[in-house]
Amino acid sequence: MASLQPIKLYAHKKGPNPWKVALILEELGLPYETTYLEFPDAKVEPYISLNPNGKLPAIQDPNHSIELFESGAIIEYLIEQYDKDGKLSHESLQDKSLARAWLHLQMSAQAPVIGYKVWMGRTYDASQIVSANEFLTLEIKRVLGVLDKHLAKMGGPYLLGSKVSYADLAFVPHYMMLPLFVPDYDPATEYPHFAAWLAALKERPAVKKIAATKAALA
């Protein structure tokens, strides 16, 4: 990896989706440089030409002359391009497909609900969104339950069994902020398999590194 040029990551200091990409870059030991933008800056040039959707993250990989946006697509690219020894991926078609399925669940079920709750909390007075907050909190917990039930069935410690994958790690940045989204809630009481899984992932050196970097930027 020493001969590689740094991958350029465009990110937001607080938003969890860019930290998903940073985590995979760290786990794979890839060189990268981060440019932090505020959300309004993502809606205008020059960034809007890189990501027409005007959201973060995006990457520029000078090693393969590719520019890419959408965190899930970036993760899949990084795995296919750089995880040649299978550190975060699996060999069989079945396991590869299951890992993609869990990544897609993260993108379609975990991230949007948390994003909506954050946006509504910033946009409306709490008294105006009581029922919406209740629904979103229940949906956040529902996804915890989905993960907990699957981990219990698999016997753990990870989504695909004994080996960690990029799909496990994709969930981490959002759940590192769980106390902010669901205050005064301990998932270990209701979902012990989920809690053990998340605790194990938080002990990984790459997770600790991005957590420390994010805290330093706060």
Swiss-Prot record:
Nucleotidyltransferase listed as a keyword: no
GO MF annotations in UniProt: transferase activity
EC number(s) reported in the record: 2.5.1.-
GST C-terminal domain location: 92-218
Domain GST N-terminal span(s) in chain numbering: 5-86
InterPro entries recorded: Glutathione-S-Trfase_C-like, Glutathione-S-Trfase_C_sf, Glutathione_S-Trfase, Glutathione_S-Trfase_N, GST_C, Thioredoxin-like_sf
Matches recorded under PROSITE patterns: GST_CTER, GST_NTER
Keyword match Cytoplasm: no
A family per Pfam: GST_N
Pathway involvement of the protein, from the record: Secondary metabolite biosynthesis
Induction line: Expression is positively regulated by the oosporein cluster specific regulator OpS3 that binds the promoter at a 5'-CGGA-3' motif. Expression is negatively regulated by the global transcription factor Msn2 that binds the stress-response element 5'-AGGGG-3'.
Top-level taxon: Eukaryota
Keywords annotated in UniProt: Transferase, Virulence
Disrupted gene: phenotype observed: Does not impair the production of oosporein.
SUPFAM superfamilies in alphabetical order: GST C-terminal domain-like, Thioredoxin-like
Role: Glutathione S-transferase-like protein; part of the gene cluster that mediates the biosynthesis of the bibenzoquinone oosporein, a metabolite required for fungal virulence that acts by evading host immunity to facilitate fungal multiplication in insects. The non-reducing polyketide synthase OpS1 produces orsellinic acid by condensing acetyl-CoA with 3 malonyl-CoA units. Orsellinic acid is then hydroxylated to benzenetriol by the hydroxylase OpS4. The intermediate is oxidized either nonenzymatically to 5,5'-dideoxy-oosporein or enzymatically to benzenetetrol by the oxidoreductase OpS7.
PANTHER family assigned: GLUTATHIONE S-TRANSFERASE-RELATED, TRANSCRIPTIONAL REGULATOR URE2
Family: Belongs to the GST superfamily.
Protein name: Glutathione S-transferase-like protein OpS6
Gene: OpS6
